Structures are given as structure tokens and as C-alpha cells.
């Protein structure tokens, strides 16, 4: 059986045949019985293939790129060098198609300690000498091929990025996308599926076709989507739970555009002191270079290159071996050993072997330091027999680190590695040549300028052309679309929306995660944003006044006070498909609105651009406009981008995904009493709506691209709701000010499904125990807002009168910048007056209490018993998956 065909457990353990191998520099104490045995095979003569045009094309290098490669080398490349250039000049590693766009992001702030593009993760000051390191990355293609391992190693990779910076990982978040998991898109009571609205046409496979509505899905596709969904969630749970990091927040969307190409974005946040920041730089000529972690195998071979090409059935099968295999228990040992090692001051630089493995870690550390690096592959622990230099350099076997040690302190380092029973080997040295030199069996197999492959890849200015389908999107109007009426229509619409898997409770997902480990979780999954407490034991051991890469000289300091950090991750792919600029703005606005609802203002952000091919002008336009929207949003909310990830070529034979520029925003809650959750608290509390009930300047009144339009009418079209960034920023600062002033008991933003869904969630989303919800009703009167007759033009206006407010727009429209808050009756007038004084519309709309949700409007009222709503919302996904 080949290595790539082994069962996952065997691949993770990597137990080779001892008779065929010889020992490396260090073997764990349990020797041959260890599942982490570190050994190397005897040298075997290998004939490298000739470099032909076909081989160059197979490595995804253009003729122009290959010519540039030869100019850099001044000769023909070796096969190993060809592989090195292939992965380092792939989009996944080089961002050659997106780097000009990324420069438009706001990246500066007085709080930024390590900025975008500098290191493995950004670092932001949170006061009292403490800082947080955070980042989001994708593992989309691997998860499409092997969902469990693809998702698991996505978590492992982002966790390594954090502790590589010298920070202790304290929480994880994820953002997931899949095709529909129900044939009709909606799961009803007792496992039945809801009634379907009018379906949109079958997907157009052209590069930039009209977005299609998600409810329609074939049974075979539904089963595949469920398999991918279950595998990804299981992989995330396995790695995070075993490592011991709480997964405290996330989002999951289901849409037809993600069939065959799921999105798996993993975020991690860690804590450190300012002086503990570690750099991934090969500093100090003559310093030894250590390899730490399990032996190198053929798993994950050229995974970075695989992630930089279209996902097809053929490529998925051919690249199954490019999916890495993770071992969270090994990662935990590596993490603890690295943090202990950093506290000694013996480390000059540290880098994880993530994308492109040993290749990326060596050339990037040398390039950052302006030095060179020389390694000997014979010293690299290997678990597969007869590995070539090409395979060793391009392998993405997990849980491996490259550590540059101050010369003369090798014994300290070895002692710590041995204490944690970790495999290690001294494989090279820092040089002054500026080149990455790789030797194998006594011969030089690669000799390349480090900066040329790490930082000087080709950069492309792609053509951007607006897709033709947007003309139809913008022309869509509500005339001819039946409005809901009170009674059966409104009742049925809300029930279907709450049962739609995209809106329904994600408890089937987060109950598989340990979100309480480390005892720092303050607000767990189920509210607008998660909140985590930074405790004293969250900070790694370290010495004040010195860098983690410099010698120590004093004892550690405990933090003077605990910090509360809020986190949210967001993106509405439908909005971005219909208007990528507005969709990009809305993604940042919702993430920041979720923080505000939790009592926090932003500190910084990290983005993950999940996009289709940049080679099609219509698709590159989507990328460009999405980035423009994100950039403007981050500027408006003072949420500088500290780093992130670009994942392009997300398209299957069925067509491209909806552009999905996911953004995670991190904020600071000043005091514990400011932490706010979304569920209603007490009978008799007053419900206040902050923000305009309906954007009457929008011809679609907030229904364009809405969940209501997709689920009830089977249409994914129309310009999405406008996001006025000034209005949104004013709302957020006003809301946080009201929370800090006292009196606000709950706050919940209005997003997918509109005001009616938001109010229902406030009634049914609180858990007082694991399986015990607390249901609390509300009576809401919206008769002052519509439906109503057309309002005349204001004096001096020449524009036509604005249209009447529709009932479906009032209940289910997704007009931006709205939050439902509650307070005691005595505080209501004060909150409304303060909000209006700040320029935020505010109105009393109802009262908390009872066992039903009642919504009144001018045309009548609709009532929903809460147990039925909770059953639909809570059990929709579990019924679909069972």
C-alpha cells in the first residue's frame, strides 16, 4: 500500500518499517513503539525528470514565468528548483494576482504592533503591556477532497501561525460555506422539508453568470453536501478539542454556488506580552537551524500549488495526496515546547512549516532577515522511504517548525525538545549569501536567491470588466411580487425563514466543539459575538523588557487586570454576488455591528478573500470590488487589516462560487458589566429599534438579495441593501455608548431575515442549561412604520414620491444599520433621547413578556407560539443531517 493510501490514523502516526530506515538525530523515548518515531531512509539514487514544456505547464508556471525563473538562476533549473518556484510563485503563497489590491487596505493604527504582511499574523496592543495575535486562513480545496483532514489541518495551521508569533492560542473561530443540505432548502417539523417557492433556472456554468437561488438541489448533491458538512465540522471539532482550544464563534451559510467547492476558513487568536513578539527571521550568520516536529512524509505534497488551481473532479482525485494529515496531540506538544523555548531567549527566529512546507519556511526566514540559509535534506527526519529532494522540500506534513537558535545555546534547546519528547534535528545554518542552498546526498539540488522566491514573484494587473448579468440584477423591482399579508402568509414566511439552515440555530455544529476549555469563555456561540476573558494564565511565560528572541534577564509579570475580547466573523455571499462593493462594506459593517451589540468597539480585522479565478475579467472585477468594499468598511470603523489570506480559483465544473470576502473583527470590551447578549431578559422590558425600520430610498426596501426573497420567492436577485458607512459607524458608537452608560439589557442586530427573524431570535435563543431553552415572548407594534400610503415629496423635492412601505419589507427586509435593544421601562425615554441626539433614529416598538411573539402592523397582526418557533429554529439542521 502506498503512503497516500494508508488509513488516516496510520498516516498521522507515520510508523515506517524500521528495517528499511535508519535513525535521525533524536528518537522519542518510547522508541520503536512511538507513533512519532523519527527515522530516515538510506540514500537512493533518483533520476530527476527532464524539464519540458509539459512539465512546466504541469507546475502551473507560464512560459513568461519560466523565462524569468531562468533569468534569476542564470541557468536551467533542477527539478527540485522547478517545484520550489512552482509553489512559491503560486497564488496561495505569492498573491501575484491580488497584491496590488491588498495594498488598498487600511493597515495603520497606534495599536498595531505587527502589521499586515510583516509576519505570520498581525499583533494588536490591548493595553497593560498585553497584545493579541490573530489571523484567518482558508483550507478550501483540501476540505473539498478530504473534508475531515482538510478542515482539521486548517485549524492546526492557523494555530501554528499564532504560537509562532510567541502568543499562546486561546480561542478559535470558523466561517463555513456548503451547498444546500435539504432538497427544498428548508427543513420543517419532524424532519419534513418546507414548501418551496418558485425555483430559479439551473446554474449557468459560464464564468460570471446570474447568481442562482440555493433552495433547488438534487438528492445526490444534497447527500454530498451533507457529507462535506459533517466531515468538516467533525475535523474542526477533533483538532480543536484535542489540542485544547475553545471554538467560541463562527458562521455557516448554505448556497448552491458552494456545491462541490465548500469554504473552510479558520481563525485563531492568541495572547502575549509586547516583549514576547517573535519574528520569523533567520537572523545571525552562523546560527544553527533546527527542524522540530514529526517526520516528513508525502502527505500534503505541493498543497499550495493545488490550492491555486480550479477544483475539478480530475484535479481533486489527482491531488488527494496533497491533503495534509494532522495530529493535534503532537501540535500541543510542539506548542508548549516552543513557548517554553521562547522564554529562554535562545531563539533567534521561528517559522512554522505551513504552505509549501520546508521550502517556504527556509526562504521566507532568510528573506525577512536579509541573510541566507543552507540546509541538508539528509538530516531531515523522513517517515516515507526513498523520498526525493523535490518531495522533502514540497511536503506539507503537519506540526513541523523551523527554529533558528543562537549559536552556543544548542544544548538548552535540545533539552527542552527532549523534555517534551519531540523529534528534532539540526539541519542547517544561517549564512551571509542571501541564498537558499539545499543539499541532498552530498549534491546541491537547489541554489536560489531567497528574496527572489519569497518576495519577488511576478505581479499581475488583471483586467476587470463588470459582468453583464448585473444589468438584470439592478433592473429587478418588486412590482408583480406578491406582498405577504398578516395571518397565514406572514406566519408561514417566518417559520420557513427560521427553518432555513442558513438562519437556523447552528447548535448541531457548535455542540460538537468544546467552547469552554481553558475557562475563559464569557459569551459562547449563540449570540451576536463571542466574548473571551484574557486571564493571567493565558499569557505565555516570558521576561519583560526583552524580545522573546533575545536573552532573558528577569522574572515574568502577571497582567494587572483581565481583558475582555469580542470576536465576530461575517460575510453574505449573496450580497457580494449581486453587488460586490456593497457586499464587502456590509460584511465589515455586520461584523462590527455584532461587536457593538456585545459592548465592544473594533481593534482590528483580518480578512479571507474566497474568490473564483482572477483570470476571467468578469470574475476579477468581483474580486476588485469586494476588496474596495472591505477597505472602505475597515476605514469607516477604525478596524485596520492586520493580515489575512487570499483563496482564489474557488470554482467547480458547475461554476464559480459567489465571491465571499469573509472578515473577522476583534474588539475590546472595557468592563465586564458592559458585556451584552442578544436574548430578551425580563418581562415588562421595553423594546427599542435603533436605526430606520425600512430604507425607503431603496427601491427594493431592503429585500434585494434577502433571505426572504430566496426562501419564499425562490429568487436571488436585486441590488442588496445599501450600506451607508457613516450611518453605520454612528450607530455603533452610539450603541456602545448607551451600553457603557448603563440601562441596555440586550442588543441584537437585524441581518439575515430582517426584523422579524431578529425579534424571534431574541425570544428563543437563550439557553439556561445545555438542553433547556428559556423562551420569553414579546408584543411588537410596527403600525407606525407601514404598510402605508406613498409619502409625498418633501418641500423643494423634485423627485417622485417614495413608494409605500411593504409589509414583507418591514418584517423581512434587510435594511442595514438596525439593532433591537431592550431596557427597563424607566430607561426607555433616556435611551431614545440619547440615540436621537447622536443622529440615530430610535423608536419604542414593543414590550417583552408572555409565551408568544406578536407582530402588529397597520393591516393587522400575526402571532407565533414560541415552542413551535424554537423547535423549527433549533432542530432544522439536526433533522436535515439525520
PLM regions: where:
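Intrinsic disorder/low-complexity segments
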Residues: 1-46, 184-219, 538-562, 769-772, ...
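Glycine/proline-enriched, intrinsically flexible loops and inter-domain linkers
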Residues: 45-188, 219-539, 562-792, 797, ...
Amino acid at each position: 500500500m502506498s503512503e497516500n493510501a494508508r488509513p488516516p490514523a496510520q498516516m498521522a502516526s507515520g510508523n515506517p518499517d524500521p528495517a528499511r530506515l535508519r535513525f535521525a538525530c533524536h528518537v522519542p523515548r518510547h522508541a520503536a513503539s512511538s507513533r512519532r518515531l523519527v527515522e530516515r531512509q538510506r540514500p537512493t539514487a533518483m533520476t530527476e525528470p527532464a524539464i519540458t514544456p509539459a512539465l512546466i505547464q504541469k507546475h502551473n508556471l507560464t512560459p513568461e514565468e519560466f523565462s524569468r525563473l531562468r533569468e534569476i538562476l542564470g541557468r536551467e533549473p533542477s527539478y527540485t528548483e522547478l517545484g520550489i518556484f512552482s509553489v512559491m510563485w503560486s497564488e496561495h503563497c505569492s498573491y501575484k494576482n491580488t497584491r496590488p489590491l491588498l495594498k488598498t487596505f487600511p493597515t495603520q493604527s497606534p495599536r498595531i504592533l505587527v502589521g499586515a504582511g510583516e509576519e505570520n499574523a498581525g499583533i494588536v496592543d490591548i493595553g497593560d503591556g498585553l497584545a493579541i495575535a490573530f489571523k484567518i486562513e482558508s483550507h478550501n480545496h483540501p476540505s473539498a477532497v478530504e473534508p475531515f483532514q482538510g478542515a482539521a489541518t486548517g485549524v492546526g495551521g492557523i494555530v501554528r501561525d499564532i504560537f509562532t508569533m510567541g502568543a499562546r492560542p486561546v480561542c478559535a473561530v470558523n466561517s463555513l460555506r456548503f451547498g444546500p443540505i435539504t432538497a427544498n432548502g428548508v427543513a420543517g417539523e419532524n424532519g419534513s422539508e418546507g414548501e418551496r417557492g418558485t425555483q430559479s433556472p439551473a446554474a449557468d456554468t459560464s464564468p460570471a453568470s446570474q447568481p442562482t437561488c440555493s433552495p433547488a438541489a438534487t438528492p445526490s448533491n444534497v447527500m454530498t453536501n451533507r457529507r462535506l458538512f459533517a466531515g468538516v465540522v467533525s475535523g474542526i471539532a477533533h483538532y480543536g478539542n484535542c489540542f485544547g482550544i475553545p471554538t467560541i464563534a463562527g458562521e455557516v451559510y448554505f448556497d448552491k454556488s458552494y456545491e462541490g467547492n465548500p469554504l473552510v476558513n479558520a481563525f485563531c487568536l492568541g495572547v502575549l506580552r509586547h516583549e514576547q513578539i517573535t519574528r520569523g527571521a533567520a537572523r545571525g550568520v552562523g546560527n544553527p537551524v533546527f527542524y522540530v516536529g514529526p517526520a516528513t512524509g508525502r502527505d500534503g505534497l505541493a498543497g499550495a500549488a493545488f490550492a491555486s488551481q480550479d477544483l475539478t473532479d480530475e484535479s481533486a482525485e489527482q491531488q488527494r495526496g496533497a491533503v495534509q494529515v494532522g495530529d493535534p496531540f503532537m501540535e500541543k506538544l510542539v506548542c508548549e515546547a516552543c513557548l517554553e523555548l521562547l522564554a529562554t531567549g535562545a531563539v533567534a527566529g521561528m517559522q512554522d512549516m505551513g504552505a509549501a512546507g520546508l521550502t517556504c519556511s527556509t526562504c521566507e526566514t532568510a528573506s525577512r532577515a536579509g541573510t541566507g540559509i543552507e540546509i541538508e535534506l539528509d538530516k531531515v527526519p523522513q517517515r516515507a522511504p526513498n523520498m526525493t529532494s523535490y518531495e522533502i522540500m514540497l511536503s506539507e506534513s503537519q506540526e513541523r517548525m523551523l527554529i533558528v537558535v543562537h549559536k552556543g545555546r544548542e544544548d538548552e534547546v535540545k533539552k527542552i525538545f527532549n523534555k517534551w519528547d519531540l523529534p528534532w534535528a539540526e539541519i542547517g545554518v544561517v549564512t551571509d549569501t542571501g541564498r537558499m542552498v539545499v543539499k541532498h546526498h552530498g549534491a546541491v539540488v537547489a541554489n536560489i536567491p531567497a528574496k527572489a522566491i519569497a518576495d519577488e514573484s511576478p505581479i499581475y494587473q488583471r483586467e476587470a470588466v463588470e459582468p453583464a448579468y448585473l444589468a438584470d440584477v439592478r433592473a429587478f423591482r418588486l412590482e408583480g411580487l406578491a406582498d405577504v399579508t398578516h395571518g397565514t402568509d406572514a406566519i408561514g414566511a417566518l417559520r420557513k425563514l427560521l427553518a432555513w439552515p442558513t438562519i437556523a440555530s447552528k447548535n448541531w455544529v457548535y455542540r460538537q466543539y468544546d467552547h469552554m476549555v481553558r475557562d475563559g469563555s464569557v459569551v459562547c456561540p449563540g449570540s451576536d459575538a463571542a466574548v473571551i476573558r484574557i486571564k493571567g494564565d493565558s499569557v505565555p511565560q516570558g521576561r519583560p523588557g526583552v524580545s522573546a528572541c533575545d536573552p532573558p534577564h528577569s522574572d515574568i509579570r502577571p497582567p494587572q487586570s483581565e481583558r475582555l475580547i469580542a470576536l465576530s466573523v461575517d460575510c453574505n455571499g449573496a450580497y457580494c454576488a449581486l453587488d460586490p462593493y456593497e457586499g464587502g462594506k456590509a460584511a465589515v459593517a455586520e461584523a462590527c455591528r455584532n461587536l457593538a451589540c456585545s459592548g465592544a468597539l473594533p481593534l482590528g480585522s483580518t480578512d479571507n478573500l474566497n474568490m473564483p479565478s482572477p483570470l476571467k475579467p468578469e470574475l476579477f472585477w468581483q474580486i476588485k470590488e469586494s476588496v474596495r468594499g472591505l477597505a472602505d468598511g475597515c476605514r469607516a470603523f477604525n478596524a485596520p487589516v492586520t493580515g489575512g489570506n487570499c483563496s482564489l480559483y474557488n470554482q467547480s465544473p458547475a461554476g464559480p462560487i459567489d465571491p465571499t470576502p469573509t472578515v473577522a473583527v476583534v474588539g475590546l470590551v472595557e468592563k465586564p458589566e458592559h458585556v451584552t447578549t442578544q436574548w430578551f431578559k425580563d418581562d415588562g422590558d421595553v423594546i427599542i429599534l435603533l436605526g430606520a425600520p425600512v430604507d425607503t430610498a431603496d427601491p427594493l426596501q431592503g429585500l434585494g438579495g434577502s433571505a426572504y426573497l430566496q426562501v419564499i420567492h425562490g429568487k436571488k436577485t436585486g441590488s442588496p441593501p445599501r450600506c451607508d458607512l457613516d450611518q453605520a459607524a454612528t450607530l455603533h458608537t452610539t450603541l456602545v455608548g448607551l451600553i457603557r452608560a448603563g440601562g441596555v439589557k440586550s442588543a441584537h442586530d437585524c441581518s439575515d431575515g430582517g426584523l422579524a427573524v431578529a425579534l424571534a431570535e431574541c425570544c428563543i435563543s437563550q439557553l439556561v442549561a445545555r438542553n433547556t431553552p428559556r423562551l420569553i415572548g414579546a408584543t411588537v407594534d410596527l403600525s407606525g412604520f407601514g404598510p402605508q400610503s406613498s409619502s409625498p415629496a418633501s418641500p423643494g423635492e423634485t423627485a417622485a414620491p417614495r413608494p409605500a412601505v411593504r409589509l414583507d419589507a418591514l418584517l423581512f427586509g434587510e435594511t442595514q444599520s438596525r439593532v433591537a435593544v431592550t431596557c427597563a421601562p424607566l430607561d426607555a425615554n433616556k435611551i431614545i433621547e440619547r440615540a436621537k441626539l447622536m443622529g440615530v433614529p430610535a423608536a419604542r416598538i414593543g414590550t417583552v413578556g408572555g409565551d408568544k411573539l406578536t407582530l402588529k402592523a397597520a393591516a393587522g397582526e400575526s402571532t407565533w407560539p414560541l415552542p413551535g418557533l424554537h423547535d423549527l429554529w433549533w432542530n432544522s439542521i439536526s433533522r436535515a443531517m439525520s
